[in-house]
């Protein structure tokens, strides 16, 4: 999108947001709406964010009456959408102590882009902040240099923008090391921590025996000197660490005097290359939750043990503990979620990038045409229960269908097409609706001049079904390269053309309809010559009779009457004029489907359309080979 188009889209979304909520539009919601409709703008996140501020300012300057009038005139569809009836959304359970507002946080590691697993915490926290009001903090937890990808900082923010989360502030932990160092000093002074110089194996043996190591009873002054020595480079990696004093009799060994600071010589942190003393997660999280005023923490129950560890630090400082809610584990199958596996796969060329549709990243979902609102709604529907579950892709697709079905334009896509001449048919013009629920969108025009492209599989299905009916249980025999005539021509190189092409340029190849069915035996040894087999309805055009003459199917005009087609229980199939189509490849997680689509599909790049009788698909690009589309769902 050009700059002016981005500004116009942002202004309309900001206008709709203001009219809907009766106030100043929220930047996160506006940006999320635009990026949800145009995921390709993720790469322009900074430009979009800057333009959003101007759009919001322009809308804020209008009176409520002016906003309504302007939205009605500029986008009647968006105004009408405000009054559409929606299903009642699932309500999340109340949070204890949230009556006066909340401060919540989403805290990912910058090891890669966000994936569907991150979306649960992100969406649940966002929903609660919107429900109760308050602040929503994005906290980049990058205190472990081994888990930092420099490119991930921007990717995480782009994914946050795509989701449309109402983030009010962003904090990066690597920028807060001086704060953590000062708090560690205070904790030592309070007698709540000490510097341990024991060898790891020796400390573990003592810990397992529920005994204190010699360092635990060191005077505060000694501990402070050792702490300064750590900061000044006086120890090598593994020679010293800071441990918090807990209960040595705790039945869980992992709770006994666990470390909160360690020394790492390598790798260097990309943002603070001179740092060698690193806070561990359980310390930096407590420090930030307290200093940032976090009131409620929603996270997975795999963090229950961390919650117990962190309470020791809260108690040492005398700080108020946030309200914790731990939800059950969510198993996700069918996609790759491991950042290390994704990294390796991209480096090896196994995946095309972070948005490869075999991955579980949010940007992969966006490329497939999944709406951010669908992701959020699916996660809110799952809720914060503590029972372990398996993530349902079908539920996500159902949520997405609610969003895309009312707006996606309809087109014909003919997979693995056959070119068929329709005997006895005069020229016809088909007028197919762009969307059955929006007459105002108008129609697509398809001109029939004698020859059409039809799906090969449909003809197989019809012929097999009909021959089964007339075979009387006889054996089947493959015609082996005999189903080829002036009426039926297999098209095997459809992707050689990138624009509308004519049938005169298509190869007339010898072949068999049965060849794509692994030599499936289609023709009965006993058949009735010139027997009418069945009727098909070419959608929005006319009826076609298929007859079987020996081993060759023939197609003839069967009239315009839709009533006749219904009476004959004719299958309604998609088609294309043989003289006007664009090659199209529909990519799925299992492979690809090559075929042809309407030329108008080339105007839908970046949008989700419905290929009638096939699936919803996001039009990704138009290349020299034709249209590239990604399967969304059925």
Swiss-Prot record:
Does the keyword ATP-binding belong to this entry?
yes
Q: Where is this motif: 'HIGH' region?
A: 108-118
Q: What is its main location?
A: cytoplasm
Q: Which Gene3D superfamilies match?
A: 2.40.240.100, HUPs (3.40.50.620), Ribosomal Protein L25, Chain P (2.40.240.10)
List keywords of the entry alphabetically.
Aminoacyl-tRNA synthetase, ATP-binding, Cytoplasm, Ligase, Nucleotide-binding, Protein biosynthesis
Enzymatic reactions: tRNA(Glu) + L-glutamate + ATP = L-glutamyl-tRNA(Glu) + AMP + diphosphate
A single Gene Ontology CC annotation of this entry is: cytosol
Drop me one GO molecular function for this one.
Answer: glutamate-tRNA ligase activity
Q: Give a yes or no for keyword ATP-binding in this entry.
A: yes
| Short name of any one Pfam family annotated for the protein | tRNA-synt_1c
Its subcellular locations are: Cytoplasm
Tree of life domain: Archaea
Output the GO biological process annotations, alphabetical, semicolon-separated. Answer: amide biosynthetic process; glutamyl-tRNA aminoacylation
Which InterPro entries does the entry mention? aa-tRNA-synth_I_CS, Gln/Glu-tRNA_Ligase, Glu-tRNA-synth_arc/euk, Glu/Gln-tRNA-synth, Glu/Gln-tRNA-synth_Ib_cat-dom, Glu/Gln-tRNA-synth_Ib_codon-bd, Rbsml_bL25/Gln-tRNA_synth_N, Ribosomal_bL25/Gln-tRNA_synth
Entry's EC annotation: 6.1.1.17
Job of this protein: Catalyzes the attachment of glutamate to tRNA(Glu) in a two-step reaction: glutamate is first activated by ATP to form Glu-AMP and then transferred to the acceptor end of tRNA(Glu).
PANTHER family in the record: GLUTAMATE--TRNA LIGASE, GLUTAMINE-TRNA LIGASE
Which family does this protein fall into? Belongs to the class-I aminoacyl-tRNA synthetase family. Glutamate--tRNA ligase type 2 subfamily.
Q: Protein name, please? A: Glutamate--tRNA ligase
Organism listed in the record: Methanoregula boonei (strain DSM 21154 / JCM 14090 / 6A8)
Task: Give the encoding gene's name.
Answer: gltX
